[in-house]
Amino acid sequence: MIALDAEQNMILATAARIAREVVKPRAAEIDEKQEFPWDIVGVFAENGILTPLLPEEYGGIGASYLLFAMIIEEIAKVCASSALILIAQADGMLPILYGGSRELKQKYLPGLAKGKLAAFAATEPGAGSDILSMRTRTNGRDVYKISGQKCFITNGSVADVISLYAYTDPDKGARGITPFVVEKGAQGLSYGRNENKMGMRGSINSELFLEDLVVPAENRIGREGDGIGNLMSTLNTCRLFAAAQAVGLAQGAIDEAVAYAKQRVQFGQPIAKLQSIQFMIADMAAGTEAARLLTYQAARYIDEGKHHLVPKFCAMAKFIASDTAMRVTTDAVQVMGGYGYMKDFPVERMMRDAKLIQIYTGTNQIMRLVVGREIFKV
C-alpha cells in the first residue's frame, strides 16, 4: 500500500481538484484548436504543482518523485497534454537541479516555480535513440558559440529556459557532451515550426536552430564533458514521468468506458451486464493497476537513492505503462463502439494521445534494450 502523510494527501487532492474543475472542461478544446493552455500553466504555478520537485529554497515544495508521479497521473486522467506540460517543465529543470552551480540554480529555478517555462533539448533530426550521433557543436571557452539543430523539443518555442546538450569535444564521444542553459531570445537562437501532431495537441513541440548561439561560460551546467551522466539521469526520471502519464491516461479511459457501459442499453439491459464487456474492463483494470505499482516502485527507488536500480525500473515502468495505455485506450474505444470513435467522447483523444508515450523519452523498443543490458550487465 502507498501511504502518504497529511500534507502529501492535501497536495494530491489539490491536483485532483484542478484536474476535475479546471483541466477537464478545457481538454477537448485544447486538442481541437491545438492550443497551448497558458491559463492552465498559471493555475499549476499558483497551486505549487508546476515545479513540485524543486526544494523550497527555489520556490518548490520539495515533493518526492512518488508524489510528483501521482500528481502527473491525476492530471493525465483528464488531459494528457496538460500532464505533459508538467513533465516538460521537470525535464527542462532537472539538468540544472542535478548539475548546475548554486549561482545557476538561484538564477533560473525560482522563475520556473513562478510560471516561466523550461525545455529539454537533446533530440536532433539525425539523433534520436542514438543520441551520441548529435551534430550540435560548440567552440570557445569564456563565451561558447553553439551551432546545430534540435527537433521535437517539448515547450521549445514557449520556453524561457532551455537545457541544451552539445558536443564540446566530439572526439571524446560520450565524454565530450556538455549541457548549457540557454535563455529565450539568446543571440543565435531561432525557431522553426511547431509540429502538427496526431495527439498531445495541447503541447508544443518545436524545431530549434542554433547559429553561433552565444552562451556565457557561467551558463554551462557542470564541467565540460560531464553531460552524459546529467543526460542519462534526466532521461531516467523522464521515463518515470512518462509512465505516470500513461497510467493516468489508462485510468481515465477506464473511467469513461465504465461510465458509458453502465448507461448504454442494448438487448434490454446495460452493456455493463454483458460478460464480454466485463472481461474487457477486467483486463483493462488489471493491466493498469500492474503498471501503476511498477511505476510507483520506480519512483520509490529514486526517492530512496537506489541508483543501481533506477535505469532498469524506470525503463520497465515506461514501456509497460505506455503499452498498457495504448491497449486500454483502444479497448475503451471498442467498448463504446461508434460513439468511442467520435470526437464528442474523450476516449478518441485518449487513444491518439497514448501513442506518443510509446515513443518519447526513448521508444519502447529501446526501453527493452535498456532493461536487457541492465539484466545481463553488457
What are these model-predicted stretches?
Residues M1-S82, I87, G99-L104, G115, ...:
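Alpha-helical interface subdomain recognition
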Residues D212-N230:
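Long, acidic (Asp/Glu-rich), low-complexity accessory segments flanking structured domains
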Residues G126-S129, F152-N155, D169-D171, K197-I204:
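Short Gly/Pro-enriched turn/cap motifs at secondary-structure boundaries
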Residues K114-T123:
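A short, Trp-centered hydrophobic/proline-enriched beta-strand micro-motif
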